[in-house]
């Protein structure tokens, strides 16, 4: 990656709340990650799938030691370093897969520290998601959709869904809830297998329904890109988790 390309990606991350790196997961690691993920998904209980109907699945990467290889993959560190984060701290990770015929993912943001002033003033992400896509992903099978810039500015969806992480929204108790609706400003983020999408945890995002008969799988890994720069209260809270 050239310095100009890296700078462009960083500016997009700061401005829009996300950026994309194409074809950065090598074919062998992609294949093995898909195999392990499929095994875990095949073993998932029907109860789990019903509870996570909107998300699809939410399986911790701690369920299989293989994922240590993906977490430590040079491609992840290199992408974060290119964005100006040479010393990130890993937090958690999940296998998130929308089965064929599953509904949209609800609109939400994933940051929790809104009682800290820096949550509103920081230009760079305090927490970032790294989404590794294992299959080609389009609007037909559940690609990511985002509301650009909502990591730094308010949107009506913040009021519509002040607390999106509820059991009712995950299970799609009310399919007509505003959390699932398309938004005029939404931007689709279609990707190819092996692509990496990096985003700010404060960004409002969701995913389209999977209208195909095949599962759509992404491995979402969470990092603190600039751990040493976080405020003491936030680091203290995270150290307890």
Positions of PLM-derived features:
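Short, solvent-exposed loop/turn segments at secondary-structure junctions
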Residues: 26-27, 95-100, 112, 137-139, ...
